[in-house]
Amino acid sequence: MSKLPLLPTTVIGSYPRPKWLRESIRLHKAGKISDEDLQEAFNDAVIAVLKDHYNAGVDVPTDGEVRRDEMVEFFAERIKGFKFYGPVRVWGTAYYRKPSVVSKIEYKKPMLVDEFTFAKSVSYTDNLKITITGPYTIVEWSYNEYYKNKKDLVFDLAKAINQEIKNLVEAGAKIIQIDEPALHTRREDVSWGVEAVNEAVKGVNAKLVMHICYGEYSFVAPYLNELKVDQINFAFKIYNYKPLELLKRYGFDKELGAGVIDVHNRRIETSEEVANDIRKILEYFTPEKLWINPDCGLKLLSRKIAYQKLVSMVEGTKVVREELKRKGYSVD
């Protein structure tokens, strides 16, 4: 990793696919363009996403997860033991290809190495982050038709993910984020769910980040310091920063990734609003352990709005950096 400034800015993972990529995917499904043409479109989209992140001033970018349709489906398609029967309705007219576990979970081959290697080759920084969905969330959002209990399934999946993460490190990944938005869904699962995440990152030599977003933070707060990761990032903006008090109460002692951008609202935060929110966070945590990010992935927004939100996030962060510099902090 290269040296980062005080209050590094990053994204959670996903970013809106360019319209022309969505059209290329449609044409490929219709058999009108080749696999090679689709891969070229994916590669071009990664370059476009990284350009947006660069122009916005993001310190730690991602490839936007543009090759992935969904955060669970992508991995279930590539790990032995899963099967898809068809889409299920999530709400209204929204459908999701929910996977089912029908046999023992086994790691087959690298899933993310090729996409990381390409993103690394075109990235403007070696502080490139790669994301992977965690074992608990994949299981929670799947059907179990094989294992006698959920815990055994999660731990088998954690072992498979551990192999993938180690392959990413071997390919040069320095910052790896495990996405566990479902970890705090069920209070009774949290303690062993944390153990499963630790199994997934066992023996990994990289900067490890975990993402937690919407849900009941009070379920997971007592266990956060047990996670074998360097940083945990949270959705805060949507909760008006109320979880800060909870984390402080439980003595949260890791790096904190603070969500300051509401990804479900098309309103674009101003840079001064972001700066005020960061000042609020600094009442609870020191700047040396604070990173700045959106609440969650940006993929559901338009590309224009997502980009403008990132610009506000970065500009607001710069305002606070300058204030800290005047107080004697080293910010570069």
Curated annotation (Swiss-Prot):
Binding residues for Zn(2+): H211, C213, C296
One of the GO biological process terms: methylation
EC number: 2.1.1.-
Pathway annotation: Amino-acid biosynthesis; L-methionine biosynthesis via de novo pathway
Family: Belongs to the archaeal MetE family.
Reported function: Catalyzes the transfer of a methyl group to L-homocysteine resulting in methionine formation. The physiological methyl donor is unknown.
The name this protein goes by in its record: Methionine synthase
Organism the protein comes from: Saccharolobus islandicus (strain Y.G.57.14 / Yellowstone #1) (Sulfolobus islandicus)
